[in-house]
Amino acid sequence: MFMGEYQHNIDIKGRLIVPAKFRELLGDNFVITRGLDKCLFAYPQEEWKKLEEKLQTLPLTKKDARSFTRFFFSGASECELDKQGRINIPSNLLQYADLEKETVIIGVSSRIEIWSKSEWDDVFNEAEESFADLAENMIGFDI
C-alpha cells in the first residue's frame, strides 16, 4: 500500500525521483496518466489492469463514460524507473499537471499521485480546513 508525502524536484530533462519506499511497490514498469484535480496518477501494472477491467465494463452508450475513458486512457503512458530511481514524465502530462520543478508525491492506497507543490498546498489546505466535514460524509462508507 502506498502512503506518505514526499517532495522532489523535476530536473531539466523532465525526470523525477520516485521515493525509495514507492519503487518496489510500483515495480519496474508502471502506468502514469492524468489524474483528477490536476495531478497525475501512477499505478503498478497489476492495479492498472484491475482498473482497466472495471472501466471496460462502462457502457459505450453513455457519453460521460466515453468521455472519461477517452480522457483517462489517452493520457496514459507506460514508464519505467532508471537506475537512479527516476521516471521521465511525458511532456503532455507535465503540462496537464502544471509540473515545472517542485513536486509533491503522495501515496494514496493503490496508487501514487504527483502534484505541483503549489497545487498540492492549495488542495491540502482546503482539505485540512474541512477534514472533519469530509470525515462525517464518509460515515456511510463504514470507515
Swiss-Prot record:
Subunit and partners: Forms oligomers.
Pfam families: MraZ
Family stated for the protein in its record: Belongs to the MraZ family.
InterPro entries per the UniProt record, alphabetical: MraZ, MraZ_C, MraZ_dom, MraZ_N, MraZ_sf, SpoVT-AbrB_dom, SpoVT-AbrB_sf
GO CC terms: cytoplasm; nucleoid
Any GO BP annotation: negative regulation of DNA-templated transcription initiation
Protein name according to UniProt: Transcriptional regulator MraZ
Chief location of this protein within or outside the cell: cytoplasm
Subcellular location, record wording: Cytoplasm, Nucleoid
Keyword tags: Cytoplasm, DNA-binding, Repeat, Transcription, Transcription regulation
Residue ranges occupied by any SpoVT-AbrB domain in the UniProt entry: 5-47, 76-119
GO molecular function, one term: DNA-binding transcription factor activity
CDD domains for this protein: MraZ_C, MraZ_N
